[in-house]
């Protein structure tokens, strides 16, 4: 279903291999080895401008957050169409003033996902051919011919075959002229390096998120917590997958090159962002106030949970007070539940009113756009009709 994704990746690898092997005369194995790094350079070079826009847009979006909050406060309690329209226009003008594109952060992800899927498809298809390594069925992969795929299968780096992986059956390793120990001694340092640079990348991303996280948003806080867990687990993926799964030496090399490049690119872009777009004092004060409010909410939540657990424990230790403690827990829970429900109901009511007003505004915009299209078509049609002219005789009479 995703076979079309292998074409751009295989095309890039083919061009690098042709340049290195046919153009510069490098050994076939060395050419394939360097082609993996060439693939990283090509993909990252294409994505880099979009990644920069994403970082810049993210920083500027954070910078204007106090101004957006001020606009929201200005229109608090006003849900009529005129107010919503005016508020939307102010948001739009603010984004335009700071040159912010709300969709800038989507492009790198939209590019990287198909590239990554295509990459692993190509490398796995090349390293694990149909029919097995002993009797591979000649076949082309994307833009790579069957002969090029076969030359890749015969490629070696430091005498370790590119298709070999740690969990490969012993007979296949013997067929490739290597052993599990040789493969492990080569790829283990690679997976460790990949894990280390993954940790560095996640640490930089975590630091950026800590600087600009929107503590007033439950969605943002939830994503930040999930990212913290991911930052802990992500460095383990190269080690676990590399040592237990069918991940060939070629993918280990790609992981190292990709993570090293990503770390360097992220560090450089972060430095430029900090130098050219430092966080303003207005944002720092707003962010500190948001964080203090969030921490106070979390402190109250922990105090509530701790008190409830303590009361439950005391019910066991002091049975004669069980009814009293149970009633206390029930009252605490009821008050907290009612407060949360009231807050949610208020937010829901406001959101419902705003959605209704925004729906009407969008319908009006669609109707205006439809009328403009009709007027444009009518104008094009009238311009296309030739006006009738009275015939005149040659004498001019």
Swiss-Prot record:
Residues 327-397 are annotated as: Disordered. The chain crosses the membrane at residues 30-50, 107-127, 183-203, 227-247, 253-273. Its main location: membrane. The keyword Secreted does not apply. Residues 332-352, 358-370 have a biased composition (Basic and acidic residues). InterPro entries: YidC/ALB3/OXA1/COX18 (IPR001708), YidC/Oxa/ALB_C (IPR028055), YidC_ALB_C (IPR047196). One of its GO terms (biological process) is protein insertion into membrane. It is found in: Cell membrane. GO terms for molecular function: membrane insertase activity. It is a multi-pass membrane protein. GO terms for cellular component: plasma membrane. Keywords: Cell membrane, Chaperone, Membrane, Protein transport, Transmembrane, Transmembrane helix, Transport. Required for the insertion and/or proper folding and/or complex formation of integral membrane proteins into the membrane. Involved in integration of membrane proteins that insert both dependently and independently of the Sec translocase complex, as well as at least some lipoproteins. Aids folding of multispanning membrane proteins. Belongs to the OXA1/ALB3/YidC family. Type 1 subfamily. Interacts with the Sec translocase complex via SecD. Specifically interacts with transmembrane segments of nascent integral membrane proteins during membrane integration. This is Membrane protein insertase YidC. It comes from Corynebacterium efficiens (strain DSM 44549 / YS-314 / AJ 12310 / JCM 11189 / NBRC 100395). The lineage of its organism: Bacteria, Bacillati, Actinomycetota, Actinomycetes, Mycobacteriales. The gene is yidC.
């Amino acid at each position: 279903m995703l076979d079309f994704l292998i074409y751009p990746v295989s095309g890039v690898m083919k061009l690098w291999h042709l340049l290195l092997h046919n153009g510069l005369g490098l050994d076939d194995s060395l050419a394939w080895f360097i082609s993996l790094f060439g693939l990283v350079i090509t993909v990252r070079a294409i994505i880099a401008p979009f990644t920069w826009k994403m970082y810049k847009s993210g920083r500027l979006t954070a910078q204007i957050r106090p101004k957006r909050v001020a606009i929201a406060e200005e229109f608090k309690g006003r849900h009529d169409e005129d107010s919503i329209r005016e508020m939307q226009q102010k948001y739009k003008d603010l984004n335009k003033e700071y040159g912010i594109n709300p969709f800038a952060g989507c492009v790198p992800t939209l590019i990287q996902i198909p590239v990554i899927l295509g990459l692993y498809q190509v490398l796995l298809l090349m390293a694990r051919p149909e029919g097995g390594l002993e009797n591979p069925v000649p076949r082309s992969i994307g833009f790579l011919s069957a002969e090029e795929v076969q030359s890749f299968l015969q490629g070696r780096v430091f005498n370790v075959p590119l298709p070999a992986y740690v969990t490969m059956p012993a007979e296949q390793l013997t067929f490739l002229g290597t052993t599990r120990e040789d493969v492990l001694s080569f790829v283990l340092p690679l997976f460790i390096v990949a894990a280390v640079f993954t940790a560095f990348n996640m640490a930089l991303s975590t630091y950026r998120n800590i600087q600009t996280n929107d503590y007033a948003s439950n969605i943002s806080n939830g994503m930040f917590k999930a990212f913290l867990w991911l930052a802990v687990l992500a460095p383990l993926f190269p080690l676990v997958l590399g040592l237990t799964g069918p991940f060939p030496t070629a993918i280990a090399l790609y992981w190292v090159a990709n993570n090293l490049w990503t770390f360097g690119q992220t560090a450089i872009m972060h430095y430029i962002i900090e130098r050219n777009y430092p966080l303003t004092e207005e944002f720092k004060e707003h962010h500190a106030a948001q964080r203090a409010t969030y921490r106070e909410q979390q402190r109250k939540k922990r105090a509530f949970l701790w008190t409830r657990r303590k009361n439950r424990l005391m019910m066991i230790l002091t049975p004669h007070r069980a009814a009293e403690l149970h009633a206390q827990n029930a009252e605490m829970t009821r008050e907290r539940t009612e407060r949360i429900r009231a807050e949610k109901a208020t937010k829901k009511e406001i959101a419902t009113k705003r959605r209704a007003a925004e729906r009407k505004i969008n319908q009006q915009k669609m109707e205006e756009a439809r009328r403009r299209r009709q007027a444009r078509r009518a104008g094009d049609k009238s311009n296309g009709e030739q006006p009738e002219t009275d015939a005149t005789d040659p004498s001019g009479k």
